[in-house]
Amino acid sequence: MLQITPIPALSDNYIWILQKECQAIIVDPAEAQAVFAFLAKHQLNPTAILLTHNHHDHTDGVAGLVAQFPDMLIYGSEEVSQFANQIVYPEQQFELLGLKVRVIESAGHTAQHISYLVDNEYLFCGDALFSGGCGRVFTGDYQAQFDALQRFKALPDFVKVYAGHEYTQSNLKFAEAVMATSCSLMEHQERADILRSQHKPTLPSTIGVEKQINPFMQAVTLDEFIILRQKKDNF
């Protein structure tokens, strides 16, 4: 049975651990020590790392983990080639721990950002999509980020969204400022506030929920998306 657990890291990162029996897959290790502690506590053997993009708060733990577990497979796009020993490309599919993994192009935040859709049910999207928001455009461009959101919108509503940061509360404040008031948005703001007051993650979300509460997922045109993204950058 698959278990998915977030390890809080740095100020607001999540390192996601996919656990199946005694084996584990690590997504975007921001640091190594927290992962070591989790693996030891649960007596897990890490078999692979999935990297979404080349920002230090998603890769800084790789070197330490590889030093301890040198046989791990490390997947990523060409922009993380200094870490990855398995370079993957959009729409490539592979299997880990009996799980089918599909690579989804999600550039924009960075030029070669990718996401991983596991068993057509679990989306590990790094900084391409957050609950209520999306990543800033750095080394990618607005068109690429907009296109990535269209790919996410095309996924089934039941797909769970495992983003790389706990940004939900601030994102929903922005959503409240730019979207028409809705019961769904208010309910999710209340839910996020309660969870964070209990020091619990607001993630995962789902694609269906994000279509309702995420202004960037509701942008119909590129121009509309750019206006929203620039407003959020200065919010």
UniProtKB/Swiss-Prot annotation:
Q: Which CDD domains match?
A: hydroxyacylglutathione_hydrolase_MBL-fold
**Could you say which residues bind Zn(2+) 2 here?**
D57, H58, D127, H165
Q: How would you classify this enzyme at the top EC level?
A: hydrolase
Q: Which GO terms describe its molecular function?
A: hydroxyacylglutathione hydrolase activity; metal ion binding
Alphabetical GO biological process terms = methylglyoxal catabolic process to D-lactate via S-lactoyl-glutathione
Query: What InterPro entries does the annotation carry?
Result: Clx_II_MBL, Glyoxalase_II_hydrolase, HAGH_C, Hydroxyacylglutathione_Hdrlase, Metallo-B-lactamas, RibonucZ/Hydroxyglut_hydro
Reaction(s) the record says it catalyses: an S-(2-hydroxyacyl)glutathione + H2O = a 2-hydroxy carboxylate + glutathione + H(+)
For the ligand (Zn(2+) 1), the binding residues are: H53, H55, H109, D127
Per the entry, the cofactor note is: Binds 2 Zn(2+) ions per subunit.
What EC designation does it have?
Answer: 3.1.2.6
Could you tell me the keywords of this UniProt record?
Hydrolase, Metal-binding, Zinc
Annotated SUPFAM superfamilies: Metallo-hydrolase/oxidoreductase
Instruction: Enumerate the cofactors the protein uses.
Output: Zn(2+)
Task: Look up the record and name the pathway of this protein.
Answer: Secondary metabolite metabolism; methylglyoxal degradation; (R)-lactate from methylglyoxal: step 2/2
Q: Output the Pfam families linked to this UniProt entry.
A: HAGH_C, Lactamase_B
SMART domains attached to this UniProt entry: Lactamase_B
Q: What does the function comment of this entry state?
A: Thiolesterase that catalyzes the hydrolysis of S-D-lactoyl-glutathione to form glutathione and D-lactic acid.
Output the HAMAP family linked to this UniProt entry: Glyoxalase_2
Q: How does it assemble?
A: Monomer.
The similarity comment for this entry is: Belongs to the metallo-beta-lactamase superfamily. Glyoxalase II family.
Q: What is this protein called?
A: Hydroxyacylglutathione hydrolase
Q: Please tell me the species this chain comes from.
A: Glaesserella parasuis serovar 5 (strain SH0165)
Q: Which gene encodes it?
A: gloB
